[in-house]
Every structure is written in C-alpha cells, then in structure tokens.
Curated annotation (Swiss-Prot):
Lineage per the UniProt record: Archaea, Thermoproteota, Thermoprotei, Thermoproteales, Thermoproteaceae
Keyword terms, alphabetized: Ribonucleoprotein, Ribosomal protein
Family affiliation: Belongs to the universal ribosomal protein uL29 family.
Keyword Amino-acid biosynthesis (UniProt): no
Keyword Aminoacyl-tRNA synthetase: no
Superkingdom, taxonomy of origin: Archaea
Name recorded for this polypeptide: Large ribosomal subunit protein uL29
SUPFAM superfamilies tied to this protein: Ribosomal protein L29 (L29p) (SSF46561)
GO MF annotation: an example: structural constituent of ribosome
Example of a GO biological process term: translation
Annotated organism of origin: Pyrobaculum aerophilum (strain ATCC 51768 / DSM 7523 / JCM 9630 / CIP 104966 / NBRC 100827 / IM2)
GO cellular component annotations of the record: cytosolic large ribosomal subunit
Length: 75
C-alpha cells in the first residue's frame, strides 16, 4: 500500500466507484490495525495513521460529491 501515499483527489475521482469502495475498505482495515498498534504502544510509522485518515476522508468526500451531483440531476 505504499503507492497510496500519492492518492490525490484527482486520482481518486478517476477511479471507478467500486475501486474506491474496495480501497476504502482496505484503508479502514489498515486504520484499525494501526490504531490497535498505537494502543499497545508500538507503531512503526505513526504518521501513517494521519495519512490513512486523510485518504479515507478524501474518498468519502468524493463519494458525497458524486451523490449530490446525481441528486441534483434528478430534480
């Protein structure tokens, strides 16, 4: 998952919704693992927690934007 460092909004928008959801699930699982490590007092890359949270937020934001566009086009 090292390539996720460069996941900018532009790249995420170009992904298919299914790909984004799959990535979102993977990132959430990684975040749980990292949070567990942090609770135990050992995290290899503490900055990765922040990075993963931000990528998750980007994905959720993009999904919400697309949802609002669809709703707007229907009305």
């Amino acid at each position: 998952m090292s390539s996720e460092k460069k996941l900018k909004a532009k790249v995420l928008r170009e992904m298919k919704p299914e790909e984004r959801r799959e990535l979102l699930n993977q990132l959430r699982a990684e975040l749980v693992r990292l949070e567990t490590q942090r609770a135990r007092g050992f995290v290899e890359k503490p900055g990765r927690i922040r990075q993963v949270r931000r990528i998750i937020a980007r994905i959720l934001t993009i999904e919400r934007e697309e949802e609002l566009k669809k709703a707007k086009s229907r009305s």
